[in-house]
Amino acid sequence: MGALEYVPALGPKPRRSTRINVDALVKLASEVLTHHRHLGGRFAGTSGGKALADILKVGTSAGGARAKAVIAWNRRTDEVKSGQLPAGPGFTYWLLKFDGVAGNKDKELEDPQGYGAIEYAYALMAKAAGITMTECRLLEEHGRRHFMTRRFDRLDAGSKLHVQSLGALGHFDYNQAGAYAYEQAFLTIRQLGLPMTATVEQFRRMLFNAVARNQDDHVKNIAFLMNKPGEWSLAPAFDVTYSYNPSGNWTATHQMTINGKRDAFLKADIRAAGKSAGLKQGRSEALLEEVDAAVERWPEFAARARLPADVTEKIRKAHHLDLSG
């Protein structure tokens, strides 16, 4: 991801982007995640080796624990190619998160089929809350619905932008849950010389995570872009989805703190964070009202994503719309 490249010392260098079969990649990703300890014996055949080579082409630099791929997609023809190399006219560059993959999870519960549709509904809701995101959509095939988000580190012609996470810039370890604060994100924004609009944008994302139960909000899920002249900017929001497991060790509470707290936030905590961010008096409450208004429309966005009624209701009940104090 980003503009950094690593070239193998040995082996042939690919010269062009090749077409890929999403269905085959999903099946192989399931095999990889389910039988990762026995890969040597399971993919020795010619077709298996070809499929494994394909998934390595598109997936190894996407990052994260869940199965995903970097692809080039042609909107007119619906053709999908590897996104590692320039794909030619008509193609744009996307990150595809596989749906229906056995063993697909991050730190806790395995993702159910349809998880991508939840992320799509959340993307719609986040945009309604005024959060900046790239274009998102669902790629449907064989009863699966893969979440796609357009890459913000690639320009239309495929040229690259440098990207660094908050964790990378601050040398923060995202595995240390609760060790870092949203206030540190606001400080980093100031240190990079970004305008107040970037601080307001990040504050809005913090509120959305708190209200909509995106509790996998660690320091690698905030990123910054640098263009060729060396100018920094806050990257669009990403990994914005329902992530709450009240009985888990990871997402039972938030990964980053607000006013020193990881859960049970009060309006007083929001005001304190707003003061730390340099917001004018009353601005934090106004932003919270805007986010609340969008999250209250959750059933509308869930319907647009065609989520089952029981899933919609479970998530609605978990939303934290009752901040007091």
Q: What feature does the model see in each segment?
A:
Residues M1-G325:
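Phosphate/dinucleotide-binding and metal-coordinating scaffold of catalytic cores
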